[in-house]
Amino acid sequence: MYKEPLGVKVDFNTGVIPGAKKIVRRLSDMKGYFLDEKSWEELVKKEDPIVYEVYAIEQEEKEGDLNFATTILYPGKVGKEFFFTKGHYHSKKDRAEVYVALKGKGGMLLQTPEGEARWIPMEPGTVVYVPPYWAHRTVNTGDEPFIFLAIYPADAGHDYGTIAERGFSKIVIEENGEVKVVDNPRWKS
């Protein structure tokens, strides 16, 4: 009849949600995502660091329900490129999402299917609205874990394949101590 309400404790300092589904992405899980393939290969062989962890509370995939998750995106770079999440469109493209920065420093890279991109810097307290039809990826531009909360429709789904194949039209790098958003020479329109 009625679904039971749910309350869970989210540790804003660590990003951990006890009892949540946990996903761990290592650098080796992100082959082909970073521009500097040689640096990627060397770092994978040397230590294969964890790039990010996700703690998700998921509902049935049906219209009207909401999922939420925290992500802990660790600091690091491959060449000049900051660590980032794989990024995705929603499988149901007309679904939106909200992100809330809890700790650390980073940003959200967003892109339309045509490659029009936006960069939104994030720090604790920043709320980002991801409109329908936009791909999105978070980037850690700081020197500590970047932790954020995401809230999204339970039936949105994740289309990682399009990003794995085409990439983003922009990448986020460090150049002369500054965060720069530059064209991705490997982007496939």
From Swiss-Prot:
Keyword line: Cytoplasm, Gluconeogenesis, Glycolysis, Iron, Isomerase, Metal-binding
Binding residue positions for Fe cation: H88, H90, E97, H136
GO molecular function, one term: iron ion binding
Co-factor note (free text): Binds 1 Fe cation per subunit.
Annotated GO CC locations: cytoplasm
Localization annotation: Cytoplasm
Reaction equations catalysed: alpha-D-glucose 6-phosphate = beta-D-fructose 6-phosphate
InterPro entries xrefs: G6P_isomerase_archaea/bacteria, G6P_isomerase_prok, GPI/OXD, RmlC-like_jellyroll, RmlC_Cupin_sf
Pathway, per record: Carbohydrate degradation; glycolysis; D-glyceraldehyde 3-phosphate and glycerone phosphate from D-glucose: step 2/4
GO biological process: gluconeogenesis; glycolytic process
Signal peptide start-end: none
Entry coiled-coil feature ranges: none
Subunit field text: Homodimer.
Annotated PANTHER family: CUPIN TYPE-2 DOMAIN-CONTAINING PROTEIN, OXALATE-BINDING PROTEIN
Family assignment from sequence similarity: Belongs to the archaeal-type GPI family.
HAMAP family: G6P_isomerase_arch
Protein's UniProt name: Glucose-6-phosphate isomerase
Species of the source: Pyrococcus abyssi (strain GE5 / Orsay)
